[in-house]
From Swiss-Prot:
PROSITE patterns: MR_MLE_1, MR_MLE_2. The record marks E310 as: Transition state stabilizer. Binds 1 Mg(2+) ion per subunit. Belongs to the mandelate racemase/muconate lactonizing enzyme family. GalD subfamily. Keywords: Lyase, Magnesium, Metal-binding. It catalyses: D-galactonate = 2-dehydro-3-deoxy-D-galactonate + H2O. This is D-galactonate dehydratase. PANTHER family: D-GALACTONATE DEHYDRATASE (PTHR48080:SF2), D-GALACTONATE DEHYDRATASE-RELATED (PTHR48080). Signal peptide: none annotated. It comes from Escherichia fergusonii (strain ATCC 35469 / DSM 13698 / CCUG 18766 / IAM 14443 / JCM 21226 / LMG 7866 / NBRC 102419 / NCTC 12128 / CDC 0568-73).
Length: 382
């Protein structure tokens, strides 16, 4: 079997799908994208296709190493996202050829279900509470919320009080009937993170995500030493080498690699194993589409330390398409009691509605994240 063609489809709301075709008619799908930089990743995918056309798709490990090491310059969000989507599609092909789900090819199940959580948008307490109520009706009891709006490098007590007030109202509204993590989104400087985390401790969040930016990772162990709240990070780390430094330094309790950013299934399985050796849990980052989610689920079901799975059903980013709009076998992604079951169909287990993908790709938007500014007009972290 040989790879004959690679096609990319930019799609709403902010996704990109990839299709790999073979000379035997077996097709694999992947999801390579950086939110807001889809065209750049698309260019990287097509540059990498020179290494793939005419090659045997079953040699996943070799093709991964070729894509990573054949260029003198490597790593980073663009290249690793391109590799990630290609890698997902290669695993999809392998599973279809062998008539087995990807998790079966990786040694089989370590669990029968995985807890899902949902992102809840909004900065006003009333909006967040309404969002949680809606999601609870469809079975969720675990959520992730914005931990704060933009903060200055050193900000005033009013800004801290506003963030804490939102969390306090949510805990008061639901008590211990729900669990929620708080996403700082890298918006908070190290000095302000120290202040804000301490003020949030009485409300016992499940975790605090990206308390500071990944490039400030030296602060993770310092912040962790000052709080009992587990710290989470990883969506802006792109290879096992990025994660190695964080694991060695300590401080992170929950690792969040993104299967569409950090080299795909091949790389993230290695990252999961590294995390387990450090007694760090796994909760893959996934605010993206159905192929990315499927890839995450296969890792979850073969990784002992996987504890939570993010998913984007109903997320406020989903303008123009919902999580399962391009999927034919929607029932396979149904949740029971807030848990996902293993995907049982061969490969990734996603049946893509290709005609719909082609139609929606014709006028796909170029999504950009908001550009925020502080009161003094300097650029703020989003």
């Amino acid at each position: 079997m040989k790879i004959t063609k690679i096609t990319t489809y930019r799609l709403p709301p902010r996704w990109m799908f990839l299709k790999i075709e073979t000379d035997e008619g077996v097709v694999g799908w992947g999801e390579p994208v950086i939110e807001g930089r889809a065209r750049t990743v698309e260019a990287a995918v097509h540059e990498l296709s020179d290494y793939l056309i005419g090659q045997d798709p079953s040699r996943i490990n070799d093709l991964w190493q070729v894509m990573y090491r054949a260029g003198f310059y490597r790593g980073g969000p663009i290249l690793m996202s391109a590799i990630a989507g290609i890698d997902q599609a290669l695993w999809d092909i392998k599973g279809k050829v062998l008539n087995a789900p990807v998790w079966q090819l990786m040694g089989g199940l370590v669990r029968d279900k995985i807890k899902a959580y949902s992102w809840v948008g909004g900065d006003r307490p009333a909006d967040v509470i309404d969002g949680i109520k809606t999601l609870r009706e469809i079975g969720f009891d675990t959520f992730k919320l914005n931990g704060c709006e933009e903060l200055g490098l050193i900000d005033n007590s009013r800004a801290v009080d506003a963030a804490v007030n939102t969390v306090a109202q949510i805990r008061e509204a639901f008590g211990n009937q729900i669990e929620f993590g708080l996403d700082f989104h890298g918006r908070v400087s190290a000095p302000m993170a120290k202040v804000l985390i301490k003020e949030l401790e009485p409300y016992r969040p499940l975790f605090i995500e990206e308390p500071v930016l990944a490039e400030q990772a030296e602060y993770y162990p310092k912040l962790a030493a000052q709080t009992h709240i587990p710290l989470a990070a990883g969506e802006r780390m792109f290879s096992r080498f990025d994660f190695k430094r964080v694991l060695e330094a300590g401080g992170i309790s929950i690792l969040q690699p993104d299967l569409s950013h950090a080299g795909g299934i091949t790389e993230c399985y290695k990252i999961a194993g590294m995390a387990e050796a450090y007694d760090v849990t796994l909760a893959p980052h996934c605010p993206l589409g159905p192929i990315a989610l499927a890839a995450c689920l296969h890792i979850d079901f073969v990784s002992y330390n996987a504890v939570l799975q993010e998913q984007s059903m109903g997320i406020h980013y989903n303008k123009g398409a919902e999580l399962l709009d391009f999927v034919k076998n929607k029932e396979d992604f149904s949740m029971v009691g807030g848990f996902f079951k293993p995907l049982m169909k061969p490969g990734l287990g996603v049946e893509i509605d290709e005609a719909k993908v082609i139609e929606f790709s014709k006028n796909a938007p170029d999504w950009r994240n908001p550009l925020w500014r502080h009161e003094d007009n300097s650029v703020a972290e989003w």
